[in-house]
Amino acid sequence: MSSKEVKTALKSARDAIRNKEYKEALKHCKTVLKQEKNNYNAWVFIGVAAAELEQPDQAQSAYKKAAELEPDQLLAWQGLANLYEKYNHINAKDDLPGVYQKLLDLYESVDKQKWCDVCKKLVDLYYQEKKHLEVARTWHKLIKTRQEQGAENEELHQLWRKLTQFLAESTEDQNNETQQLLFTAFENALGLSDKIPSEDHQVLYRHFIQSLSKFPHESARLKKACEGMINIYPTVQYPLEVLCLHLIESGNLTDEGQQYCCRLVEMDSKSGPGLIGLGIKALQDKKYEDAVRNLTEGLKESPVCTSGWYHLAEAQVKMHRPKEAVLSCSQALKIVDNLGASGNSLYQRNLCLHLKAEALIKLSDYDSSEEAIRTLDQISDADNIPGLLVLKSLAYRNKGSFDEAAKIMEDLLSSYPDLAEVHALEALIHFTKKDYLQAEKCFQRALEKDTEVAEYHYQLGLTYWFMGEETRKDKTKALTHFLKAARLDTYMGKVFCYLGHYYRDVVGDKNRARGCYRKAFELDDTDAESGAAAVDLSVELEDMEMALAILTTVTQKASAGTAKWAWLRRGLYYLKAGQHSQAVADLQAALRADPKDFNCWESLGEAYLSRGGYTTALKSFTKASELNPESIYSVFKVAAIQQILGKYKEAVAQYQMIIKKKEDYVPALKGLGECHLMMAKAALVDYLDGKAVDYIEKALEYFTCALQHRADVSCLWKLAGDACTCLYAVAPSKVNVHVLGVLLGQKEGKQVLKKNELLHLGGRCYGRALKLMSTSNTWCDLGINYYRQAQHLAETGSNMNDLKELLEKSLHCLKKAVRLDSNNHLYWNALGVVACYSGIGNYALAQHCFIKSIQSEQINAVAWTNLGVLYLTNENIEQAHEAFKMAQSLDPSYLMCWIGQALIAEAVGSYDTMDLFRHTTELNMHTEGALGYAYWVCTTLQDKSNRETELYQYNILQMNAIPAAQVILNKYVERIQNYAPAFTMLGYLNEHLQLKKEAANAYQRAILLLQTAEDQDTYNVAIRNYGRLLCSTGEYDKAIQAFKSTPLEVLEDIIGFALALFMKGLYKESSKAYERALSIVESEQDKAHILTALAITEYKQGKTDVAKTLLFKCSILKEPTTESLQALCALGLAMQDATLSKAALNELLKHIKHKDSNYQRCLLTSAIYALQGRSVAVQKQISKAVHSNPGDPALWSLLSRVVAQYAQRNAKGGVVAGNVAHILDSNHGKKALLYTAVNQLAMGSSSAEDEKNTALKTIQKAALLSPGDPAIWAGLMAACHADDKLALVNNTQPKRIDLYLALLSAVSASIKDEKFFENYNQSLEKWSLSQAVTGLIDTGRISEAETLCTKNLKSNPDQPAVILLLRQVQCKPLLESQKPLPDAVLEELQKTVMSNSTSVPAWQWLAHVYQSQGMMRAAEMCYRKSLQLASQRGSWSGKLSSLLRLALLALKVCMANISNDHWPSLVQEATTEALKLCFCPLAVLLQALLQFKRKMGARETRRLLERVVYQPGYPKSIASTARWYLLRHLYAKDDYELIDVLVNNAKTHGDTRALELNQRLSSQ
């Protein structure tokens, strides 16, 4: 291609680019490049086209190629710059600065405007890459260029300002050249500003100063800039603040700097730098309080001023506030660490560390000393600075490391012998070791070298103070140096504290001492010792206002858990002032500070006690005693509070603890006596008179001990008198009190006092109390004591002259009490009571006294009641009623007024009498109320005609009257033991409660009281009652003797005598007595009863016909009794004459009207049905009765019993019936538990498999409730046997195999102990023997079983059942050997069974023997025989067991593959009959197994087996067997889906046998 063609192609390329045909352009360029590879324009055009086609890499390569070819040509560089600007190319950041630089070079001489534009772009690029120096230099060059071009000042100002903006943002990273260019830029920008002053100019100036302040070495320039701005803007704070802060931080705060600070504070009173500057000036002037105040306020505004924090710490150290100083130093150090490590900051850091260490050492505690050592270790070159070494030694001394401290001290002494601090250090170490003489010398040497150090004077004064009494009192010693220290350092609080000690303890000048303590506390408000001393002295000087002011100031400032001393003292102040709530709050605050201060706890207890908080006070004193076990006071207060709260036993225990420590502590002895006295009073209220006597004896013992130590204390004599008088109500026979001879005027020993002697001693004690202190209440107590003595004389019938004298004395004493205190209603009341006593009878005086008592105390139920009694005594019933009513309205719970109303009701014959007496017993126990209520209960019970009335139902039954009356009457006779009717009523009530022995005892007590009485009839009645009760308790001989002691003329006596003879077994004599009774009987009913009793007596003698004749005589009377008809019915049952029994029962049903007879009627009816063999009717009859009377537990119990005996198939219902009986009535429930257990056993395996083992648990419970019942022990034996059988089925070890013999012994022992019917005993013993032998056989204890049978046969050889048992035992080993039995043996066994031919189990056992010998037909015949017997007897369980055994026998034959249609049909027949009897899981299983044997793979086989496996209600063992066969069936059918279902079912039920089979079958 020619050059012309090249030009044409380039032109075409240029045109294509203009027309945006970039691909065409590329083609033309490539055409050119084929001819001329180094054509500049072609490469440039390629770059342009490629850039437009968004092919930056190709464009870059083209431009670079062009630039290489022609480096001084602009086009390629411009294109490259545009390309980099357009695309963020990978090499753009690296290459673009070079491109811009090349363009600058090319534009410099060609186009200044474009040069400037490129220059700005280059600066922006450098700025982005944080190349500050390049930015500064390039922009500087731009400004210079513009200056050369003659640019305006405004433009130049903006350019300089722009440069400040570029560089001001990151001054920390700049080098010196950049910084200088920045400052030059600021200066030029400020100089070129056209508006001065202006807002814009001010901001620029601020930025300039801000930048300068970041560079410490530019301090001169900073100062100049600040001063320049101050001159232009005199009202602006900023330059002043920066300048002040700069001067403060640099440590060059000159007078001029002070002026700046003052000027700044004038402008803004809260200016941080200004206040800090003023604070530093105050510190220099030793105005420490001003310094701390200004520095603290300044640092709030300027918290990052290191020097400010340092100087604040310095001022705080000077003012002896080391804790605050440590915090200030720590703050300064934190700021220094944030600023980084420069030369100045390192210096500041060392200063702060030094000061912090000094402050920490002043704190003196171990942790602070440890921290001080760590702080000193941080100071550079600390080991070479003596001052720091001194501090380290002091730190070691404070923490107890004396060896380290001494070592440093010795090194310092050798290196710096002229340094005062070193000698002072040596002195302190000697002082610590209590070597005060050496310490004195060293401090003196230190003071010789520096006399103006307050600390040295203080320490020397302290040395003298502790050196001894002499130096302490010597004014030239301790006092002089303390005063010098106080003069040199007026902020040293501790020196003022010791000056206070000096003036208080040595001089005795309390006012001056208080001034010193106040000064010390003002200087250091954490000095608890000074504060406490100031407060204590103020209290001593009776300046409570000042004391309270100090305490309030401290407590207001105190944080939680501090200032204990102040809280404690203020709490005690409030406690003394009676402000209890404030005292509690303050003492609680004191305890927060020190929870282990027992004094605080005691004070808090006192505060709680003062405001009536006994429980909280008790806790406080308890805590105090725990913290200080030696404190008697705390324990005493605990005891005293427990005594107040009525916890007398606990109080006694606490008092005893005190007495053990200090035997003569009278308050504790008094407390012990009071507690026993109060317990005696409580016992008397509960009518526990014996306890009360014991408590009084103890109380007198303690009061006597107290009087031995303090016989001059009146209250102790009064308390002893109270104790003696307290037992006035107790029966004289019970009062035998042992009193220490000291109280009776003897030197030693004890004396037993009777009631009259004790009361007399009480009067003497009151007399001694009056001699010591004559008080109205003691006169009153003495008067009451004389009254009680008079009462006792009247009760015992003693000398009437003495009685009169005592009553006169009583009146005299009570009048004296009234004269001393005429407003006390109790004294008037007591005087009234004595005045109306029968020995005086001054009713007018009594009425006057009661009225005066009411006038003295309006709410006075006692006086109104006494007034009512007075009116009632004088037969003024209406007035008495009104008085009692008034008393009731005033105090409805006051017992006596209710008794009064009851007596009025009784007098007028009101129906409310019984209710009122009952209400008195509900309120509290009182002899009059108790006797009245018991009388009305007995009276109501004796009236047999009222049983169906609502009044009887409510008063007796609903109100539970009999036990309530019995309880209160027991209390009555406990106290009043000479009133025979009370014992008679008590015996009567005990009879009703079936407490026969207690009733007999009560009747016997009545007899003893009536022996000397003239009323012989009453005595005979008591004997009759006693004899009747002896007979019912089984003491027949005593009963016979009792009745013989009566004339035996009254019908009741003769009948009682006859009954006693009958119960003793003297039937002939009993018959004679009944015949004698017949001769004198009058009423038809009584005659019927006697004839019935006579008939029973004749029956007992074997005269059945005579008995029947007598009972027939009863039945033909006009009014035959139900008892005689019941006896006739029972006689028919005994004779097995159903016709007679039925006729008697029909007659009986005509006369029975009461619901109470339901049980007897039902029992007799069901017994007749049982005699007739109608088992179903037996259950139906009782079920019908239960439905009619669902609340009768006896019927439920009977139902449970007959179900177990006659209807075992309904055993589940029998269990329910037994449980209901047990719930309704625990008495019937005892026997019902046995029936329940028997029914549970009858339910079979479904019950036995229960995890709770229901039957066994039930029978165990029954054994606990009735251990004397032999049937229960027999039942327990059966339950254990069932449990062992279940264990064998489940392949587990039986648990109770050793119990059979023990339980058999328990049955025999129970039969001997209790009297049961003979045939019942024999049956139970035989059954128990059979069960025990069976259990022994099953558990393999053959020899024991054989021994048991042999032993039983020796005592009675004629026992076919036992012989059968023996044969079963003997055959067991033979059968287990699986050898054929000889014919002779089989014949012997057959004979034995034939001798027990009516026994179903015997035939079943013989069948089992035949089966073991392969004699299947013979076995079948035996089973059929057992089935026949069971059917004849109606034994459901016998029939079921026989059918199942028969079916099992036939199935075994079938399984043996014996081809005979007889056996399969026998299985089907027997199981079908069993299923007719009841749902029988075993029968269903046997049918399924028969089907399995017949057709293993048939669908019917699976259906039958699945029914057993999956349907509920099948026992585990049966379901497991079915599961085993079903698994075999399914594997035979290869039905793996159903196999998986069955395996999951086996896993759910824990059937390991089935799972093992599955593993075996699946592996084959």
Swiss-Prot record:
Which cysteine-cysteine pairs are annotated as disulfide bonds in the entry?
A: none
One Pfam family assigned to this protein is TPR_16
Where N-acetylserine occurs, the residues are S2
Which tissues is this chain's protein expressed in? Widely expressed with the highest levels observed in vascular tissues, lymph node, pituitary, lung and intestine. Not expressed in the liver.
Q: Where in the cell is it found?
A: Cytoplasm; Nucleus
- Sequence ranges of the TPR repeats: 6-39, 40-73, 272-305, 307-339, 386-419, 420-453, 455-492, 493-527, 564-597, 598-631, 633-665, 679-713, 790-824, 826-860, 861-894, 980-1013, 1020-1054, 1056-1084, 1326-1359, 1400-1433
Q: Which SMART domains match?
A: TPR
Instruction: Quote the subunit structure annotation.
Output: Component of the SKI complex which consists of SKIC2, SKIC3 and SKIC8. Interacts with PAF1.
Role this protein plays: Component of the SKI complex, a multiprotein complex that assists the RNA-degrading exosome during the mRNA decay and quality-control pathways. The SKI complex catalyzes mRNA extraction from 80S ribosomal complexes in the 3'-5' direction and channels mRNA to the cytosolic exosome for degradation. SKI-mediated extraction of mRNA from stalled ribosomes allow binding of the Pelota-HBS1L complex and subsequent ribosome disassembly by ABCE1 for ribosome recycling. In the nucleus, the SKI complex associates with transcriptionally active genes in a manner dependent on PAF1 complex (PAF1C).
**Protein name per UniProt:** Superkiller complex protein 3
Provide the species name: Homo sapiens (Human)
